[in-house]
Amino acid sequence: MEPPNLYPVKLYVYDLSKGLARRLSPIMLGKQLEGIWHTSIVVHKDEFFFGSGGISSCPPGGTLLGPPDSVVDVGSTEVTEEIFLEYLSSLGESLFRGEAYNLFEHNCNTFSNEVAQFLTGRKIPSYITDLPSEVLSTPFGQALRPLLDSIQIQPPGGSSVGRPNGQS
């Protein structure tokens, strides 16, 4: 029997604050944050992410965010591209529809964590998934929550998952 093909799985991590969180969080929140994290999963030569427009894909580093600030090796998977795209399609029709997006409770990091576990059985780093509760645990975070709840984030540069890399 042939050994299964293994495909690398990477977590792309972007600091949406471009360093401002590191400098301003002690003053505004009373605690140090290293960044405001956006994440995506790179597998099968594409980058997949979730925002207010639903699940999208692009070539790795192909959003207007540019190259990631860091790359985490999540592991490898035996899941083929065909099965993975079917899985994403089902997620896009259920858990990860665009209207389900919520900056604090159901965001790009929730998606990356779900997909990483499906592909590799591993979670993404807790410093990323714990960020919303860290912010909301501060008086400033609670005061800003109504405003922040109305924010919808969709990194430009991707296409809907039904059309990887913008192909129809």
From Swiss-Prot:
Keyword Cytoplasm assigned: yes
Activity regulation, free text: Palmostatin B inhibits its palmitoyl protein thioesterase activity.
Pfam families in alphabetical order: Peptidase_C97
Domain PPPDE as annotated: residue spans: 7-149
EC number, as in UniProt: 3.4.-.-, 3.1.2.22
GO CC, any one term: cytosol
Role: Protease which deconjugates SUMO1, SUMO2 and SUMO3 from some substrate proteins. Has isopeptidase but not SUMO-processing activity. Desumoylates ZBTB46. Collaborates with UBQLN4 in the export of ubiquitinated proteins from the nucleus to the cytoplasm. Exhibits palmitoyl protein thioesterase (S-depalmitoylation) activity towards synthetic substrates 4-methylumbelliferyl-6-S-palmitoyl-beta-D-glucopyranoside and S-depalmitoylation probe 5 (DPP-5).
Protein's name according to its UniProt entry: Desumoylating isopeptidase 1
Source organism: Homo sapiens
